[in-house]
Amino acid sequence: MTTLSGAPLAGQVRFAVLTPDGRLIIHSAPGRASDTEWGPYQEQLWAAVRAEVDPHGGDINGIELHNGMRAKLADAAMAATTPGHYLPNPVASVVLASLGPPPTARHGTVAIVGTEDDQGRTTSLTTHQLELINHVYRLATQTPQ
């Protein structure tokens, strides 16, 4: 687990990743947004999230979590039809259930991103959000502080 202290580098957006082998990794990606007909789009951030969550090019779904966070995960139907690509992720299942959505089995790598601001841009996970994720992760893995 990487450190939770300090702010991200200027222009970077921090997000958390829960891997099927039980790791919690904090990543960052450029957060610059381009204007599109649908609003601002953070191409580099979403490419980094997609590379973690679904490198096989399937659909990605989003789930609203507590404290303004959102989870990004591989489409459940895609994960069910190609289980070799999307391994069971019991730690993510527990972490997400603790952060809002009903308990269900999750598969593949799961990303947790920060709050969407009034302009539609996803912000970096705050120190408080990272501490909450880390706390729930420790409980899910029975890791002492």
Residue ranges and their predicted role:
Residues 1-145:
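Short beta-rich binding modules
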